């Protein structure tokens, strides 16, 4: 199992109270495959550095998880399909 950090930018038209239920739906993929979700940090609505899909704001969510590489690939694939998700970035945090 490896540690991953996933940054997700959600469409700003989604209400912020719906973000938790939206994330729960996707993070279930990790827990179903015997991985763990270590932390979910909702940063809220922030201005983007440049427009994405003609929008200048997005709701940022950072997820720290421990799981297998195939599981994180499936999560990234599912997030890419959803129109509410504007952008994702999967990273392996550096160990110091």
From Swiss-Prot:
GO terms for cellular component: cytoplasm; ribonucleoprotein complex; ribosome. Transmembrane segments: none annotated. It comes from the Bacteria. Keywords: Ribonucleoprotein, Ribosomal protein, RNA-binding, rRNA-binding. GO terms for molecular function: small ribosomal subunit rRNA binding; structural constituent of ribosome. GO terms for biological process: translation. Pfam families: Ribosomal_S6. Belongs to the bacterial ribosomal protein bS6 family. Binds together with bS18 to 16S ribosomal RNA. This is Small ribosomal subunit protein bS6. It comes from Cutibacterium acnes (strain DSM 16379 / KPA171202). The lineage of its organism: Bacteria, Bacillati, Actinomycetota, Actinomycetes, Propionibacteriales.
